Amino acid sequence: MKKTMLTMGVAASLMLAACSGTDAESEAGSSGEEGGLSGTLDFYTSQPDTDATALVNAFNEQHPKVEVNVFRSGTEEVIGKVLAEEQAGDVQADVLLVADSVTFEGLKEQDLLEPYESEELDAIPEDFIDPDHTYAGTKVMATVLAVNTDKAEQLPDSWNALTDADSKDEAIMPSPLYSGAAAYNAGVFTRQDSFGWDFYQLLKDNGTSVVQGNGAALKAVQAGEKTYGMVVDYIVANAKAEGSPVDLVYPEEGVPVITEPIGMIKDTDNEEAAKAFIDFVLSEEGQKLASDLGYTPIRTGVEAPEGLKSIDEMNVLSAPLDELSSGREDDKREFKELFGE
């Protein structure tokens, strides 16, 4: 996978000014009392580069003396890096923001997260906050039906559109073996009485294609290779806004959602800056930025971008986190056996 390391933060002149004195405030991991927060902050994320850059730039407008180092990759590689560093006895990350709560539950079980009860949590729905305050969701990304409007006679309102005889060989979805969102979806769908593994068997029997990621699934729908796709909502809305012949449907049975949680790594070198960064992401300003980037904000009172539903408008499908976490590898094995991936 593509890996990038971006270094953002203060301009060279500010860094020189910060280093000109003998105060310890200029050292990495420090927080200056008079000049505000300072030092370095290592931010590990699975966000796209452009989103991570926009977030850090906005944070630095409030805290220009904090130099934010960003490591960006897919969720699996980000977590792999954290675990490798932990094994070596020195986790470099201060703040982590990756795909889903199941991933954070695993880190929590390994005692890698530091609890932090941000004041901004008052405006975040309780369902998306860890009761122990080791992580909280930052946005809402629902998996929806992507529909090619040139091929479909009308927009469906149910997930049954994927399993109807008329849709034979016309559906596509990302693989839980590669996509964190798809793995979460499999865990949620198979723990619903109205779906279960029978739903995935019907998908298989109806000729549903499987590709690695959401982007590839949407591309097939955009190109007219498939009529329907199981895809995260924001990329469908973006494609529609750009003129692609696609639309998105939130099926009446409900939708699984991932929330790209954020959390602080235990024994961070710059706790105050880490807390400030988390506060910013969850704040009204940070959530408006998420909306501007095309995501449904998780904070109440902040409008979703055009074409997407707000969290209050969604019928959310969910399952117990402990079951999703403990069952993820079994879910992947079951999927692999069923689809022959």
What are the language-model segments listed below?
Residues V144-K151, G187, T259-N270, L289-A290:
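A bilobed periplasmic-binding-protein/Venus flytrap-type ligand-binding module shared by bacterial periplasmic
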Residues M15-A18:
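C-terminal motif of bacterial Sec signal peptides marking the signal peptidase cleavage site
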Residues M141-A142, Q201-K204, V211, E242-K266, ...:
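Periplasmic-binding protein-like
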Residues S20-G21, G35-T103:
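Early extracytoplasmic/lumenal segment of secretory-pathway proteins
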Residues D42, S46-T53, T75-E76, V91-E225:
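Extracytoplasmic ligand-binding site segments that recognize negatively charged/polar headgroups
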Residues P256, I265-A319:
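Mature extracytoplasmic/periplasmic domains
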Residues D198, I298-E341:
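An extracytoplasmic/periplasmic, membrane-proximal ligand-sensing/linker region
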